[in-house]
Amino acid sequence: MVSIRPDEISSIIRQQIEQYEQSINVDNVGTVLQVGDGIARVYGLDKVMASELVEFEDGTVGIALNLEEDNVGVVLMGAGLGIEEGSTVRATGKIASVPVGEAVIGRVVDALMRPIDGKGEIHATATRLLESPAPGIVQRKSVCEPLQTGITAIDAMIPIGRGQRELIIGDRQTGKTAVAIDTILNQKGQDVICVYVAIGQKASSVAQVVNVLRERGALDYTIVVAANASDPAALQYLAPYTGASIAEYFMYQGKHTLVIYDDLSKQAQAYRQMSLLLRRPPGREAYPGDVFYLHSRLLERAAKLNDALGGGSMTALPIVETQAGDVSAYIPTNVISITDGQIFLSSDLFNAGLRPAINAGISVSRVGSAAQIKAMKQVAGKLKLELAQFDELQAFAQFASDLDKATQNQLARGQRLREILKQPQYSPIPVEYQVATIYAGTNGYLDDIPVEAVAKFVAGLRDYLATSKPQYGEAVRSSQKLDETAEALLKEAIAEYKAGFTA
């Protein structure tokens, strides 16, 4: 008979007690009271945080936006067709965050960073909260480096610096997106990572933009975030913050980034829709009271960081659509007051054939001139003045029949200066050649060339400089000034090219 040894049994029991681990999973759950129009009212979820992600039984994710006494208002980030009254909701304990890293470059994603380009999963190295505090005053440095758009009218008269926020505003179909895409194309080889955020646009329009970027090799340094018109309002509301988070990740690594929000009017409309469905009180134009904060907290994240933080930058180009040129509407005035200047595109100029249709009179850049290169400063001052005088004289000349010779000369010069600012889409011009064409225009070298031949002349002059006088481009690029050597080369090139030019 086997003898039972109590000490052995007690040691085995003691061992098992020591190894026993009781784990209790406590889930914060609630019940759906009502669902519809992309909003769910949930009872329970006692300890839910503002903007916390919640998960429904069918896998749909939502954000808890309204925390009320007896229920929680949740915005759905999906169709939510499987959600019904009485179904269970689970709080995740997480605030919305997105995967970021080098792997996202060249991809097309939705507002939650899910790939929509058919190229498989994104293997990101880090995550970043959608809503991050903007850098403080001490962490910033004043804007001091130029961000060249490749558009002569902007780089000369409304210069943009790295870390600036410059609004692009205008009616529909005035070329706002074209200006933004040209700016992305011009960043090739400039070591700038671009993020294009498409909000509430047709999927076909976004596909067109992606194709242009791919064809011109710009997708190698660009990320496209798309919340299409068919997507839920919650995704259209979140998309700009996703774009800002991606750019912020690179900015804090000491890199330069450019973010385009196309456009914030549609984001404000999506937010208005959500707010009204959540029964928040409407204000002016039925927008909620915090619509200013919606845009200010987004745009304040754009910054030029100080050297201690790596000197990275995030430049924001928000786009806002106006109705019949009314810049005094609610959203346009809000965004104008938040940004560091605006580029106003006019439908009248667009229809008159002046493209890009930039109205230089009411467009301003409040901090960009500090970032403009010296060569451009040398020629742009005269251009601004002569164009302003031309606009004034043109209005006056409509009523006067006989004009003196000086006035006629000034009008003729103004017409030629307008011609050099015209530029086809998707053809950004390097800054040294912009300087050359403005120099030729403001110093009278185009005065004897017919107005209709000016575009052909300046395009030919740029090619001639690139092929026959490459040392001019090198001199301006290296010194960033139009010094005596560069000016002599330029004068020589203009004279040589003009001698062989036929209109």
UniProtKB/Swiss-Prot annotation:
Keyword set includes tRNA processing: no
The reaction(s) this protein catalyses: ATP + H2O + 4 H(+)(in) = ADP + phosphate + 5 H(+)(out)
EC number: 7.1.2.2
Location(s), subcellular: Cellular thylakoid membrane
Residues binding ATP: 171-178
Any GO molecular function: ADP binding
First-level EC class: translocase
SUPFAM superfamilies listed in its UniProt record: C-terminal domain of alpha and beta subunits of F1 ATP synthase, N-terminal domain of alpha and beta subunits of F1 ATP synthase, P-loop containing nucleoside triphosphate hydrolases
Site feature (Required for activity) residues: 364
Similarity section: Belongs to the ATPase alpha/beta chains family.
Quaternary organization: F-type ATPases have 2 components, CF(1) - the catalytic core - and CF(0) - the membrane proton channel. CF(1) has five subunits: alpha(3), beta(3), gamma(1), delta(1), epsilon(1). CF(0) has four main subunits: a(1), b(1), b'(1) and c(9-12).
UniProt protein name: ATP synthase subunit alpha
Source organism of this protein record: Synechococcus sp. (strain PCC 6716)
